[in-house]
UniProtKB/Swiss-Prot annotation:
Residues that span the membrane, as ranges: none
Protein name, as recorded: Aldose reductase-related protein 2
Binding site for substrate: H111
Source domain of life: Eukaryota
Gene3D superfamilies reported in the protein's UniProt record: NADP-dependent oxidoreductase domain (3.20.20.100)
Amino acid sequence: MATFVELSTKAKMPIVGLGTWKSPPNQVKEAVKAAIDAGYRHIDCAYAYCNENEVGEAIQEKIKEKAVQREDLFIVSKLWPTCFEKKLLKEAFQKTLTDLKLDYLDLYLIHWPQGLQPGKELFPKDDQGRILTSKTTFLEAWEGMEELVDQGLVKALGVSNFNHFQIERLLNKPGLKHKPVTNQVECHPYLTQEKLIQYCHSKGISVTAYSPLGSPDRPSAKPEDPSLLEDPKIKEIAAKHEKTSAQVLIRFHIQRNVVVIPKSVTPSRIQENIQVFDFQLSDEEMATILSFNRNWRACLLPETVNMEEYPYDAEY
């Protein structure tokens, strides 16, 4: 079983990475160090997570210790949509690179397709609490990102939270120089994303699954929300393989050739989440897990629902 996915650029992206969304700055440094010690080589970051400085410290410490070399790591970050204008894009990218203490990124993604008004706030709002949008679109942002590739600062580009119509528009953009190599989206047994994955793979675009465990620690979680980790059928499959529910949920993606980035700051869980290459889910088990789909999203970004380009209005 391959431990990586080959991108359209021929680069190898490790199929399991460490997610860092919601990892508090005071804990994320130790989490990244624990992950590198456990064998992770793919770290998923973002400007909007406000913890890249600590992630960078961890990476540098591990490189200094000779535990790992920079070229063995696959580091991903994301451009927030308040920075779609070229000048702001360059500044945001530079901040990410400086915080991570790197001289290049392996992959740089557009975090969200809707352009937002530039400024200090991640979600700029007017007096009525309505989100303020920007006229600069993701297509214009892409041109600025392509320049980063041409300058050798980024190896590959991708998108996140895009539906297939938005990807189609990007692929059909006149003068497109660098195609997206991945679409990072929420994906788990309650949101199996079959049509979107099929579409992306048909275009030579890999898929990365975030919130693979259902994001139980998300800020908007409600007590009545479904819990993947507590799902009796998932627990049953896990018990059969002498694995945990989390390991089954991660393995589910690997067998679909989908990159998966579980988040944890607990060293024992970080280790557990990568111990997923020594068992195989049967075709029957995969079909059972796929049948759990209910198009349930943990991460809706409700602030932007009534704006143009809201990605989840489309079926996929």
